[in-house]
């Protein structure tokens, strides 16, 4: 009886074991194959609330919530379940009459054993007698850098109101692939408003300021296959985003957009804080205020914002409290000691505070260990934080600059400690020259010489056929970027959805350019 019981136990265990696909043999590299669907794929006159898809092997479903795209959009995401070799989908929404639905599974389906993907499998059905077969195709790219990203939404609307992306989810939609390409399939005949969206929050609605958006200047007819959309981030309405005091004598106002035309009305008596100066950032969206009375504790002002006055109070760092935590001192922010320096340019030293006094006798410059009796010192900014040291630099020479204590005095009366900076002046043959010849250009343009990381190395403005020469370039790989500066304001301008303003167009020279030491390179760029 003991042996009979053991045999029965083994039989029961095997009957209850989890079923897994067989292993062994040659490695499987083929994706799963669909054997059948219920209802049948491409069926008409059905309400396919329950769908069954059978495969030729065991499958798994990953990231269905993000990968499974259903168009037209449903109110609720369908539920999915895998059982053996079958995938079950349940749609709880009430389906629209006479509508073609497309279920695109993206990269969610793969075989269980090797993970081979069945990419972009589609299940299509119609609740009416006609299966819509028209499509709209195209590409989406970033308007500023022409990058093409995957999973950007492209949406179609029958409501043509300009504000529709803010308040209504699309009728049809699709997502871009890694090349920025999209295809919205199985749509009904007609004209549509088309919108591209970087949908960060996944709600199929536009959130201004946080998300990129792109639009077509005109309605798009079904069947069109070359609709290009350019994504951009709109400028926010001008207002103060935040204010802060990063240290005694300094307050910073950060705005949502360029604020250099905004009038600030001071409630604080500026003579009490001993106001010194104010300066905007390059983008004009950040204002730094300098004042000399470092025992001041607050700064107040108001500005007009759309017909009403907004009052702002900035709590200031007091010098006494700052000294208890950090040393309040005049510091050099130039950290490229022992670096190479372009002999054709002044040597620049940036300081933490505006400078009020320079003692030239406390600057000692040596050229290959030999003292230089005369050097030129000047500031290149109105705030007097960027001190330039100029001399007729010799090529292939070692320089050492010593600034003795008290060589500089800032607006707070602080003096520098001893500072020693060293650099090497390279030879002219260590650099290359790049000439860019334009032809066919009549409109105002900005030409940027950039590196492979899109950092701007040099920039010039042109409005005609010309030759632009860039001298003393470090040997490396460069690119040319051109901004079509329509309003001739010297910068790239973004777009505006409601006002139908497209972002300014940009172009890239189609090839990378290698600059070598002691070489001249000429590039022709025809429009």
List PLM regions with ranges.
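Phox homology (PX) phosphoinositide-binding domain
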Residues: 505-509, 513-523
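Acidic, glycine-anchored loop motifs typical of Ca2+
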Residues: 199-208, 485-494
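Short, composition-biased linear "edge" segments at structural boundaries
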Residues: 216-224, 502-510
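Extracellular interaction modules
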Residues: 222-227, 518
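Acidic, low-complexity Ser/Thr/Gly/Pro-rich repeat segments typical of extracellular/periplasmic
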Residues: 16-195, 209-215, 236-431, 448-472, ...
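Conserved structural position at the C-terminal beta-strand
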Residues: 196-198, 303, 482-484
């Amino acid at each position: 009886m003991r042996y009979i019981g053991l045999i029965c136990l083994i039989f029961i265990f095997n009957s209850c074991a989890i079923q897994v696909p067989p292993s062994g043999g040659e490695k499987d590299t083929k994706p799963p194959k669909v054997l059948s669907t219920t209802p049948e794929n491409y069926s008409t006159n059905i309400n396919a609330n329950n769908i069954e898809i059978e495969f030729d092997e065991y499958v798994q479903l990953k990231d269905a919530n993000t990968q499974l795209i259903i168009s037209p959009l449903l109110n609720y995401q369908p539920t999915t379940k895998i059982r053996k070799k079958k995938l079950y989908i349940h749609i709880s929404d009430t389906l629209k009459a006479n509508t073609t639905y497309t279920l695109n599974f993206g990269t969610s389906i793969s075989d269980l054993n090797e993970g081979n993907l069945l990419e972009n499998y589609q299940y299509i059905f119609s609740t009416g007698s006609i299966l819509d077969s028209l499509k709209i195709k195209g590409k989406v790219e970033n308007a500023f850098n022409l990058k093409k990203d995957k999973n950007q939404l492209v949406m179609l609307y029958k409501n043509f109101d300009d504000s529709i992306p803010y308040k209504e989810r699309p009728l049809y939609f699709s997502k871009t692939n890694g090349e920025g390409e999209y295809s919205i399939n199985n749509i009904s005949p007609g004209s549509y408003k088309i919108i591209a969206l970087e949908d960060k929050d996944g709600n199929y609605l536009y959130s201004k300021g946080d998300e990129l958006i792109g639009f077509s200047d005109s309605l798009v007819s079904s069947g069109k296959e070359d609709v290009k959309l350019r994504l951009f981030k709109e400028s926010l309405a001008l207002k103060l985003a935040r204010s802060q005091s990063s240290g005694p004598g300094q307050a910073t106002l950060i705005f949502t957009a360029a604020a250099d035309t905004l009038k600030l009305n001071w409630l604080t008596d500026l003579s009490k804080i001993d106001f010194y100066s104010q300066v905007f950032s390059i983008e004009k969206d950040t204002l730094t205020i300098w004042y000399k009375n470092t025992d001041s504790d607050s700064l107040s002002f108001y500005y007009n914002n759309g017909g009403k006055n907004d009052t702002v109070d900035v709590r200031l760092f007091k010098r006494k409290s700052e000294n208890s935590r950090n040393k309040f001192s005049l510091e050099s922010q130039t950290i490229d000691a022992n670096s190479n320096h372009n002999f054709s340019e002044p040597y620049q030293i940036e300081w933490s505070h505006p400078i009020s006094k320079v003692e030239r006798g406390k600057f000692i410059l040596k050229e290959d260990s030999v003292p230089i009796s005369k050097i030129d010192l000047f500031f290149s900014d109105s705030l007097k934080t960027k001190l330039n040291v100029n001399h007729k630099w010799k090529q292939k020479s070692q320089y050492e600059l010593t600034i003795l204590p008290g060589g500089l005095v800032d607006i707070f009366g602080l003096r520098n400690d001893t500072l020693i900076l060293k650099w090497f002046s390279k030879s002219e043959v260590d650099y290359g020259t790049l000439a860019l010849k334009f032809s066919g250009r009549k409109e105002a343009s900005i030409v940027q010489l950039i590196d492979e990381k899109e950092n701007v190395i040099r920039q010039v403005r042109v409005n005609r056929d010309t030759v632009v020469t860039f001298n003393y370039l470090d040997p490396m790989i460069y690119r040319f970027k051109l901004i079509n500066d329509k309003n001739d304001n010297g910068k790239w301008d973004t777009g505006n959805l409601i006002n139908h303003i497209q972002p300014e167009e940009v172009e890239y020279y189609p090839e990378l350019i290698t600059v070598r030491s002691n070489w001249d390179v000429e590039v022709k760029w025809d429009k």
